[in-house]
């Protein structure tokens, strides 16, 4: 029988083995302080399952988009400290990012110990899925565990390339849970079924979106994704980000699913993220010198009303640049509305 999830592995195949766990610790950090550790906490069951069975656990993640440069503000060291608190035990951290330095750290790991590698995207080879880099990562471990659901679609070295070198490759509990949930929503969602899509790019979500939009009763769109749809409708979006290569698909979707797709009716905008003092709330049309960075209060109210009394909700991607307080309101309000809906019995 194929081994699909980490719990399918016999304890004998875990004890003493080096388990490389790809996680998603892309969390908001400012001045070394993590403002939201939800993504870290969600990986704890997988990590503890492995350590309780004597594995030597190697955690790896990205943080931000350093594009192959070492940027101190994008170091994962604060994550290792928070992880130590959550696990109640020390978590090692690889200061030395060279292959020899990393290997020396891992060779020194004892059973049930955990180490976190430095930001993988400090290496350009990670996002390039460079074969030798993939092979080097694979040489560090005996088992590959993918528990990074949010980045599993990316063809990077740590999410794709290195996995090809393992006989033992399985999903962690987080990925397994999300896949089960997606399968249920795809095959037999409870209705009314609401899909909420945010984040920066459509193309990162296109496969899931195409499947879910067919099943959904309503699709609420925010984040950077919304500006491609708004531009496709001929609405002035100022300097907001768009994906021009997705414009035709967005136009077709708006026609095909008319009445099902909801777009922001107002925005929190500014001249730039650096010039947040210029922050204003504008209606659907955004002035040329401004960029949209969050959904506005009218949109928040509208979307919350659409979330109430639903059978199932699928949410992927923030409503704005939530890492910055000035543009976090939309994401926070939607998160609270979904939490309330979940408490009332909605499948989320």
Q: Across the structure, where does each feature detected by a protein language model lie?
A:
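Active-site loop-to-helix "anion-binding N-cap" substructures in soluble metabolic enzymes
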Residues: 1-348
């Amino acid at each position: 029988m194929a081994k699909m999830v980490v719990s399918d592995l016999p304890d004998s195949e875990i004890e003493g083995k080096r388990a490389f766990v790809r996680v998603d610790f892309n969390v908001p950090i400012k001045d070394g302080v993590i403002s939201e550790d939800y993504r870290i906490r969600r990986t704890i069951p997988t990590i503890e399952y492995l350590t309780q069975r004597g594995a030597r656990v190697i955690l790896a993640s990205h943080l931000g988009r350093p594009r192959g440069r070492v940027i101190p503000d994008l170091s994962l060291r604060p994550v290792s400290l928070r992880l130590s608190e959550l696990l109640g035990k020390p978590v090692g951290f690889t200061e030395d990012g060279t292959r020899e330095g990393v290997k020396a750290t891992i060779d020194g790991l004892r059973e049930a110990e955990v180490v976190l590698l430095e930001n993988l995207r400090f290496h350009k080879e990670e996002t390039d899925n460079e074969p030798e880099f993939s092979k080097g990562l694979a040489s560090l471990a005996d088992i590959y565990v993918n528990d990074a659901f949010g980045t599993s679609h990316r063809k990077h070295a740590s999410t794709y390339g290195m996995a090809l070198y393992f006989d033992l490759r399985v999903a962690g509990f987080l990925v397994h849970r999300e896949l089960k949930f997606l399968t249920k929503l795809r095959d037999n969602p409870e209705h009314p079924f609401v899909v909420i899509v945010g984040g920066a790019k459509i193309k990162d979500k296109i496969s899931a979106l195409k499947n879910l939009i067919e099943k959904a009763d309503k699709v609420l769109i925010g984040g950077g994704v919304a500006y491609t749809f708004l531009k496709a409708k001929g609405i002035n979006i100022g300097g907001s980000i768009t994906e021009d290569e997705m414009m035709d698909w967005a136009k077709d979707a708006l026609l095909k699913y008319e009445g099902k797709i909801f777009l922001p009716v107002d925005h929190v905008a500014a001249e730039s993220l650096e010039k947040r003092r210029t922050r204003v709330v504008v209606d659907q049309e955004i002035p040329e010198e401004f960029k949209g960075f969050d959904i506005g209060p009218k949109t928040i109210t509208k979307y919350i009303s659409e979330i109430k009394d639903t059978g199932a909700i699928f949410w992927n991607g923030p409503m704005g640049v939530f890492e910055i307080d000035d543009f976090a309101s939309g994401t926070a309000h939607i998160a609270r509305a979904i939490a309330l809906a979940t408490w009332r019995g909605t499948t989320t």
